[in-house]
Regions:
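Extended aliphatic helical segments
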Residues: 5, 10, 23, 38, ...
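Active-site rim loops that border cofactor/substrate pockets in soluble metabolic enzymes
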Residues: 1-43, 48
């Protein structure tokens, strides 16, 4: 992307920064998390996969907005196992200690290849 900006093929503002996305996500979450709430469906793991879930602790801990509800559920598809000790293989309960999920948040993990499982889940949800 940077090379295209340097060549003046695209503007740097074509793509939002991580900060811009987090600000947008916080506004979206505040507008949509009332009532039944908003669930979190994560494909994969690690730092990149965990980025958007951090909007809740940012609002609750950093901004001190104590009326922010936790995610209403958490589901992750991951092929990384806990025994390897990687961040991608961390179980959903670890997210409780960081304020990303509540102890009562329903948590699910599907240990499989996301390229196989995600399309099956999406097809079921869409009624295909």
């Amino acid at each position: 992307f940077a090379s295209y900006v340097i060549k003046n093929d695209v503007k740097a503002t074509t793509m939002k920064s991580g900060i811009e996305y987090m600000v947008w996500l916080s506004e979206w979450y505040r507008a949509n998390s009332s009532g039944k709430g908003v669930g979190f469906f994560q494909i994969g793991g690690g730092i990149a996969g965990d980025f958007p879930i951090c909007v809740v602790p940012m609002m609750y801990q950093d901004l001190e907005w104590h009326d922010v509800p936790f995610w209403s559920y958490f589901c992750q598809i991951s092929d990384s196992t806990t025994s390897y000790g990687s961040y991608s293989g961390a179980v959903p309960n670890e997210k409780i200690t960081w304020g990303k999920l509540d102890i009562h948040t329903p948590k699910y993990i599907v240990e499989s290849d996301a390229t196989i499982v995600a399309p099956l889940i999406f097809a079921w949800i869409l009624g295909w």
